[in-house]
Amino acid sequence: MNILIIGPSWVGDMMMSHSLYQQLKIQYPNCNIDVMAPNWCKPLLARMPEVRKAIEMPLGHGAFELGTRYRLGKSLREQYDMAIVLPNSLKSAFIPFFAKIVHRRGWKGESRYILLNDLRANKKDYPMMVQRYVALAFEKDVIPKADDIPVLKPYLTVEPAQQAETLKKFEKQTALLGERPIIGFCPGAEFGPAKRWPHYHYAKLAEMLITQGYAVALFGSAKDEPVGEEIRQALPEELREFCVNLAGKTNLNEAVDLIANCTAVVTNDSGLMHIAAAVNRPLIALYGPTSPQYTPPLSDKATIIRLIEGELIKVRKGDKEGGYHQSLIDITPEMALEKLNELLAK
């Protein structure tokens, strides 16, 4: 059986989708799984053994372009027995429909009654995103209840030779860290500061960790480079050599190798949080307005710190200076350090 997955467009969602691919291999041991996703996803999909190949989705997030979707679908005809559509959007279901794939499975989403012929309508019965993904591995009449959904934790393979090449490439940037064990920080998050632990808290935590004998490496995209530099500059000058800002200096593949080399990771609710979980790093996940009930790090080595209760608070702008959210400001560096030390002592 050949299965086409229409994959998600965000790092965290892509990582959680790996639980689905693992379950599909259990349900259909001889199946081939191809994933259509943005080009940047390819390094992640290449590290998932269950995926045969990644197919580039050339359209950006939000682009409709029905003609392009028709041509893509037509090019995939007579290649697949089943399609599973993970995004909820109407447009994401067009390609399998145009490909004339017989079985087209997904959640109802934006009223996709014609485009999907194996439609699941009870999404609210599955409170976690990963449960919703894995549920699509099952036939409609045997789908387990949420509490019985088997969630196989996402993982990314890390090849020692490739990782060694990556570490060598960044030798110059990390030389001053010496032999100190490295704690990775992932201080960025989509949609701005409202989901971020304040940079001054990260700086204070870095100062305490460096004083304890650790080094700190900052990870993120080019958009996160400024906040990484804010963290470094907030450190006492004599400690800055033990903190390296790699945000914007790595591609995603290199970030995976470097994060896998860290002793532990401290992170906001972000895509890199899910990557740190997938390479089995002990991690402290800092949550504020977003809810770990929906998209937690899927790892036995994760400790979540969240001081407020309830589900997702839809906020794109923080309520305090710098755009930070009060619920994240209230998480002190001392709290994070205490939980991190407990985690490392296990």
Curated annotation (Swiss-Prot):
Cellular component, GO, one term: cytosol
InterPro entries linked: Glyco_trans_9, LPS_LOS_Heptosyltrfase, RfaF
Pathway in which the depicted protein is active: Bacterial outer membrane biogenesis; LOS core biosynthesis
Gene Ontology MF annotations: ADP-heptose-lipopolysaccharide heptosyltransferase activity
Keywords: Glycosyltransferase, Transferase
Record-listed E.C. numbers: 2.4.99.24
Catalyzed chemical reaction(s): an L-alpha-D-Hep-(1->5)-[alpha-Kdo-(2->4)]-alpha-Kdo-(2->6)-lipid A + ADP-L-glycero-beta-D-manno-heptose = an L-alpha-D-Hep-(1->3)-L-alpha-D-Hep-(1->5)-[alpha-Kdo-(2->4)]-alpha-Kdo-(2->6)-lipid A + ADP + H(+)
Biological processes annotated in GO: lipopolysaccharide core region biosynthetic process
Superkingdom as given in the UniProt entry: Bacteria
Keyword Mitochondrion among UniProt keywords: no
Sequence intervals crossing the membrane: none
Record-linked NCBIfam families: heptsyl_trn_II
Protein family membership: Belongs to the glycosyltransferase 9 family.
Protein's UniProt name: Lipooligosaccharide heptosyltransferase 2
Source organism per UniProt: Haemophilus influenzae (strain ATCC 51907 / DSM 11121 / KW20 / Rd)
Gene transcribed to yield this protein: waaF
